[in-house]
């Protein structure tokens, strides 16, 4: 027989090996976890430890209710779960299709009680070798509901109802699994595993391919602003942004030398054109994984920084997570376990301009080592802005089942990599006394915003089709809690500078980009270098 258990400030359901636990987690919010292990892990994932709040617990013969401000969760003896707002209106309910279940939400209150022989549970743990599980969680679909957020996907739809979204990081795709509903709730899938979220007409479904437990956070609010505020309180707010980031950023693939950078900056200054930031792209280094300037082309970085600052221009440099065997740092990083490993085959993650492996951003010591190297070779010259490119990271083949981080297999923890990459630089800058921290990062996960992330949409195509996709991508990134976001004006690849159609695209993209959080030029144009 199942049990409904009251705790001082939480409720639980137990049956066979499964434990379901609900507890208050911030204003008008609940954290919901389930496991088939003897106890829950201590992992917070995207969440921060909340301020203490006392929930109300109500019991009747068949249910336990946990009420925290404007949200209530009702849990019955069969383990079914539904959420309501302060007016008693149904927000969300699990989908069960069993002969013995009739639904705990609105369907139970109707005269037409519906049972099913499909044998589908609202929470499904499928055992995997090694003691982990493949998790599926199902919710009832609601007619007329609109859904927003979830990060950045290359598609034109702002309303995600009807969409199937891969929960994985790819170049131009950022999985930030927080969804906001027009019914007045927000839900964070608090799990960094590779998986899928499907918001179909018949039901919604979340899957994690490898995990130890189910973990999500749900909040209720009467407006998008209220829901977003509660989410930011739960996962972190971005640091104060310096005023200069709202100006023009000059960037391209690529400036090859110190002289090229200074020539462009001097011409802006001569024409009295305001310029906030100049960006030095990749391969200004001697080898991947050295994180320093090549002295042949960049003989005096300190003098370059000082001259740019005299013209009111800040300098940003690109930092890739790639490390090649020719790097003098490779042997130490490999020996210390600071590189991503492969479970099978050759340990090569990306073969762009060399066979490289990514440093393991989930490893605290690896993050510190990379920052210490960056501090010595960039920050100490006066460079305080960093472009964390390839931050997904971008594998040569996205065989997520083949790679392993310090934090665990990529299938289980992979989506946290861009957040941890950003955290290493945020922590390093904070330790040096910096408070206004903004770093350009080519990916995000839930909680990235608290590490000063300015996300951008990656290597998108130079076309009106792609341009249309960015409109939805940027809005949904903001609704997923990543407020600082930008694009490559005109798209990254495919633009012909001699084509009048591309001129039109570039002008329209510029006109729109003025109203984005950051106005940044970038692209791969002729002459190609």
Swiss-Prot record:
It holds the Pfam family Gal_mutarotas_2. GO terms for molecular function: carbohydrate binding; hydrolase activity, hydrolyzing O-glycosyl compounds. GO terms for biological process: carbohydrate metabolic process. The keyword Hydrolase applies. Keywords: Glycosidase, Hydrolase. SUPFAM superfamilies: (Trans)glycosidases, Galactose mutarotase-like. The active site is at residues 389, 392, 459. Its EC number is 3.2.1.-. Disulfide bonds: none annotated. PANTHER family: HYDROLASE, PUTATIVE (AFU_ORTHOLOGUE AFUA_1G03140)-RELATED, MALTASE-GLUCOAMYLASE. Belongs to the glycosyl hydrolase 31 family. This is Uncharacterized family 31 glucosidase ORF2. It comes from Pseudescherichia vulneris (Escherichia vulneris).
